[in-house]
From Swiss-Prot:
One of its GO terms (biological process) is DNA repair. Gene3D superfamilies: 3.40.1360.10, 6.10.250.240, RecR Domain 1 (1.10.8.420). PANTHER family: RECOMBINATION PROTEIN RECR. A zinc finger (C4-type) spans 60-75. SUPFAM superfamilies: Recombination protein RecR (SSF111304). This is Recombination protein RecR. The keyword Zinc-finger applies. GO terms for molecular function: DNA binding; zinc ion binding. May play a role in DNA repair. It seems to be involved in an RecBC-independent recombinational process of DNA repair. It may act with RecF and RecO. The lineage of its organism: Bacteria, Pseudomonadati, Pseudomonadota, Alphaproteobacteria, Hyphomicrobiales. Residues 83-178 form the Toprim domain. Belongs to the RecR family. It holds the Pfam family RecR_ZnF. The gene is recR.
């Protein structure tokens, strides 16, 4: 008896879906079957959307955001406060803060957090480009909106040290972000409160 229940194309779809965070082999099979059942209304539009993303999505060369233009729509928005940069670990955190609609500032995506055990040091993150933005622009405040984890706090302290010779105010998110919590899982009200009550480092 063959160990493959379906054809190679369907098996490949299941294997790729299983790589998505939150999906396992069983949930990937269920998702694949659902997509196949909804071929015209979901599978085909999803395939077209994925192909469009492959063709058009890029990383913003200024802040590290994901968009279909470079610079991204946030960096091109003239209504943003050019003197304030919110530093986040990942694009998911940027999107979470944007949903809170509290501060119309600029962003800087680090692309992760310092984690020596995982081999992630300063050279693997977008820290040098952050320093360059401070050098080249009249930045007055850096808001460190990193996750309240050991690695996140280590990253915050490292960035603070790197910017210690500049006359820039450095703040971090205050109450509302639980220790060990990650921004993408917080509700909009909690994020808004944390931004409003940020504190100096």
């Amino acid at each position: 008896m063959s160990k493959h229940i379906a054809g190679p194309e369907i098996e490949r779809l299941i294997q790729l879906l299983a790589r998505i965070p939150g999906f396992g082999p069983r949930s990937a099979r269920r998702a694949a079957l659902y997509l196949i059942k909804k071929k015209e209304t979901l599978l085909e539009p999803l395939g077209a959307a994925i192909q469009a993303a492959v063709d058009k999505v890029c990383i913003c060369s200024v802040c590290g955001n994901v968009d279909t233009t470079d610079p991204c729509s946030i960096c091109r928005d003239p209504r943003r406060d050019d003197t304030t940069i919110i530093v986040v670990e990942d694009v998911a955190d940027l999107w979470a803060l944007e949903r809170a609609r509290t501060l119309a500032a600029r962003y800087h995506v680090l692309g992760g957090r310092l984690s020596p055990l995982d081999g992630i040091g300063p050279d693997e993150l977008n820290i040098t480009s952050l320093v360059q933005r401070v050098v080249q622009n009249p930045i007055m405040e850096i808001i460190l909106a990193v996750n309240a984890t050991v690695e996140g706090q280590t990253t915050a302290h490292y960035i603070t040290d790197q910017l210690s010779n500049f006359s820039v105010k450095i703040t971090r998110l205050a109450h509302g972000v639980p220790v060990g919590g990650e921004l993408d899982y917080l509700d909009d009200g909690t994020l808004a409160a944390a931004l409003q009550a940020r504190t100096n480092l």
